[in-house]
UniProtKB/Swiss-Prot annotation:
UniProt KW rRNA-binding keyword: no
EC number: 2.1.2.9
InterPro entries: Fmt, Formyl_trans_C, Formyl_trans_C_sf, Formyl_transf_N, Formyl_transf_N_sf, Formyl_transferase-like_C_sf, Met-tRNA-FMT_C, Met-tRNA-FMT_N
Natural source organism: Bifidobacterium longum subsp. infantis (strain ATCC 15697 / DSM 20088 / JCM 1222 / NCTC 11817 / S12)
Pfam families, per the entry: Formyl_trans_C (PF02911), Formyl_trans_N (PF00551)
Disulfide bonds: none
Binding residues for (6S)-5,6,7,8-tetrahydrofolate: 110-113
Catalytic activity: L-methionyl-tRNA(fMet) + (6R)-10-formyltetrahydrofolate = N-formyl-L-methionyl-tRNA(fMet) + (6S)-5,6,7,8-tetrahydrofolate + H(+)
The protein's role, per its UniProt record: Attaches a formyl group to the free amino group of methionyl-tRNA(fMet). The formyl group appears to play a dual role in the initiator identity of N-formylmethionyl-tRNA by promoting its recognition by IF2 and preventing the misappropriation of this tRNA by the elongation apparatus.
Class of this enzyme: transferase
Stated name of the protein: Methionyl-tRNA formyltransferase
Any one annotated GO CC term: cytosol
One term of GO molecular function: methionyl-tRNA formyltransferase activity
Keywords: Protein biosynthesis, Transferase
Length: 328
């Protein structure tokens, strides 16, 4: 039985933790995660999803900073043979990598070397990739450039959000991850160097990146919205010559509008407007459309600043938009 230390923080790491903890080939001797963080309006200190699951499973937890002497002491005391790391959120220094005899192995949510970096699933959707996947690779000092031990590829539907894609890859990748590290322990794993071609970097998507430019074509905006959902959330500014009602009776000359769901407008629908300028709004009985650099985009669900998420048509009726209202 291999002694394994697991490092991870968010929800996408939980399926892999569960898979290792319930596999008889492994003894999870410790779980490394980031410290409790303040969340919600009350800013209450809350454990990470991985820490919560580890405590539920009765596993020891290390939530210290990886460059501290206390962290190294705690890691060495585990006497782990091998380590799994997925979405931990901290860079592991060389002395930490060297402390585990068989090395550290990462489950990365792309087919490397495409989309190395922090946001592989998001970038795959934004780029309109027809396929993506998950790879298990050995961690080194470079950025996601180690040899690949296992890989899976899936087809994208063209309608998933990054949150949905990450959930799918986390679930489908977990059993592959476990089998790959078991093969490493047995000495039967095959290590394949990453090819030099197809290298692209998946830089983190910032809030400013998520702002929509309505002069882009509808398909590109649709991909941007899905890539930014749920985080950091695609958004735009709503403007009008007169004040905009904000559903509760208050008014503002402009407000931030988050676009939670949208789709390219159905061109076969006779109600779909054909000549909207970029950023121009058209409100129907059951639909809200926005002009783009190509064909209109239909808004499905939105969230105005300080308000709850709601159907776009319901929001538009309550907002009582002036004919001059637009987004930009």
């Amino acid at each position: 039985m291999l002694k394994l230390v697991f490092a991870g923080t968010p929800d996408v790491a939980v399926p892999s933790l569960k898979a290792f903890a319930t596999d008889p080939r492994f003894d999870v001797v410790g779980v490394i995660t980031r410290p409790d963080a303040p969340t919600g309006r009350g800013r209450k200190l809350t454990p990470s999803p991985v820490k919560a699951k580890a405590l539920e499973l009765g596993l020891p937890v290390i939530d210290l900073k990886p460059r501290s002497p206390e962290f190294m002491e705690a890691l060495n005391d585990l006497h782990a043979d091998i380590a799994a790391v997925i979405a931990y959120g901290n860079i592991l220094p060389k002395n930490v990598l060297d402390a585990v005899p068989m090395g550290w192995y990462n489950l990365h949510f792309s087919n490397l070397p495409k989309w190395r970096g922090a946001a592989p699933a998001q970038r795959a959707i934004w780029a309109g990739d027809p396929t993506t996947g998950a790879d298990v690779f050995k961690v080194g000092e470079g950025l996601d450039d180690g040899p690949i031990v296992a890989s899976l590829t899936i087809e994208l539907t063209g309608r998933e959000t990054s949150g949905e894609l990450l959930d799918r890859l986390a679930e489908e990748g977990a059993p592959m991850y476990v089998d790959a590290l078991a093969a490493v322990g047995e000495g039967t794993a095959t290590f394949t160097a990453q090819p030099a071609e197809c290298l692209e970097y998946a830089h983190k998507i910032t809030v400013e990146d998520a702002r929509i430019s309505w002069t882009d074509e509808a398909g590109a905006i649709d991909r941007q919205i899905r890539a930014c959902t749920p985080h950091p959330g695609a958004w735009t500014e709503l403007f009008a010559e007169g004040p905009i009602a904000d559903n509760d009776g208050s008014t503002a000359k402009s407000l931030t509008l988050h676009i939670l769901a949208a789709q390219p407008a159905d061109q076969s629908n006779p109600n779909t407007p054909a000549d909207l300028k970029p950023g121009e709004l058209k409100v129907g009985k059951k639909n809200v459309w926005v002009g783009t650099g190509s064909t209109p985009l239909e808004l499905i669900q939105v969230k105005a600043q300080g308000k709850k998420a709601m159907r776009a048509a319901d929001w538009a009726r309550g907002a009582r938009l002036s004919p001059a209202a637009c987004v930009r």
